[in-house]
């Protein structure tokens, strides 16, 4: 595995690889890799001749009161996870390398961002789309891999890739969970012992809602109210949202049908956790 820290070298490598006909699987991350990221890397390894992993904590996607400075970082651990999962190139640029001067252009996302996490984090998805536009141009991937834990992000990325005719296939990868159902996340380290015991109730609330939908409930408000009440009963967390939308359009639905997402965000003392399920309802 080769570690690359400059845009110029990474772009030179990927241009040569693509010119020689090699397929490139790309996994963009902010580091502090866990089993969820490893799953993305293994999927990329299965489907491509070359795997490129990026580790970059992107300042553009953090708001003024968010956790940029305390976002967990451990490059030695990330290198080990990368090597264990067959990465060929680890792209590890500095902020100065990615943004040598103030951006004169950013990508503004106008749909799919005014709900869920986007409602709470104005500018977040513009930051995500801007850094991905840069990373796609640097790594020139055939396929790029994203976990469905950030399902809104996946919907936004699929939209912007289609809108700008970017020649990359976006591959959705299912959420990876702990044995008790908690979605794996770099931010889980911020949970206290007591909160860690409560956190699996996020997924349990979604499973309960799914059972009600499969039993015939079609009223979206009834389902989201059930989820909120369940989380408020079984955790000390504060429900930020529990919402149901069409997916991937993220349009509001009153009656549940077609492809939908049920998504939640819950604030604990030092961390905000998100989770979701997607399902097709006939």
Curated annotation (Swiss-Prot):
<dbReference type="InterPro" id="IPR014729">
    <property type="entry name" value="Rossmann-like_a/b/a_fold"/>
</dbReference>
<keyword id="KW-0547">Nucleotide-binding</keyword>
<feature type="active site" description="Proton donor">
    <location>
        <position position="37"/>
    </location>
</feature>
<feature type="binding site">
    <location>
        <begin position="184"/>
        <end position="187"/>
    </location>
    <ligand>
        <name>ATP</name>
    </ligand>
</feature>
<feature type="binding site">
    <location>
        <position position="153"/>
    </location>
    <ligand>
        <name>(R)-pantoate</name>
    </ligand>
</feature>
<dbReference type="GO" id="GO:0005829">
    <property type="term" value="C:cytosol"/>
</dbReference>
<keyword id="KW-0436">Ligase</keyword>
<protein>
    <recommendedName>
        <fullName>Pantothenate synthetase</fullName>
        <ecNumber>6.3.2.1</ecNumber>
    </recommendedName>
</protein>
<dbReference type="GO" id="GO:0015940">
    <property type="term" value="P:pantothenate biosynthetic process"/>
</dbReference>
<feature type="binding site">
    <location>
        <position position="61"/>
    </location>
    <ligand>
        <name>beta-alanine</name>
    </ligand>
</feature>
<keyword id="KW-0963">Cytoplasm</keyword>
<dbReference type="InterPro" id="IPR042176">
    <property type="entry name" value="Pantoate_ligase_C"/>
</dbReference>
<feature type="binding site">
    <location>
        <position position="61"/>
    </location>
    <ligand>
        <name>(R)-pantoate</name>
    </ligand>
</feature>
<dbReference type="GO" id="GO:0005524">
    <property type="term" value="F:ATP binding"/>
</dbReference>
<comment type="subunit">
    <text>Homodimer.</text>
</comment>
<feature type="binding site">
    <location>
        <begin position="30"/>
        <end position="37"/>
    </location>
    <ligand>
        <name>ATP</name>
    </ligand>
</feature>
<comment type="function">
    <text>Catalyzes the condensation of pantoate with beta-alanine in an ATP-dependent reaction via a pantoyl-adenylate intermediate.</text>
</comment>
<feature type="binding site">
    <location>
        <begin position="147"/>
        <end position="150"/>
    </location>
    <ligand>
        <name>ATP</name>
    </ligand>
</feature>
<comment type="similarity">
    <text>Belongs to the pantothenate synthetase family.</text>
</comment>
<dbReference type="InterPro" id="IPR004821">
    <property type="entry name" value="Cyt_trans-like"/>
</dbReference>
<feature type="binding site">
    <location>
        <position position="176"/>
    </location>
    <ligand>
        <name>ATP</name>
    </ligand>
</feature>
<keyword id="KW-0067">ATP-binding</keyword>
<keyword id="KW-0566">Pantothenate biosynthesis</keyword>
<dbReference type="GO" id="GO:0004592">
    <property type="term" value="F:pantoate-beta-alanine ligase activity"/>
</dbReference>
<comment type="pathway">
    <text>Cofactor biosynthesis; (R)-pantothenate biosynthesis; (R)-pantothenate from (R)-pantoate and beta-alanine: step 1/1.</text>
</comment>
<dbReference type="InterPro" id="IPR003721">
    <property type="entry name" value="Pantoate_ligase"/>
</dbReference>
<dbReference type="Pfam" id="PF02569">
    <property type="entry name" value="Pantoate_ligase"/>
</dbReference>
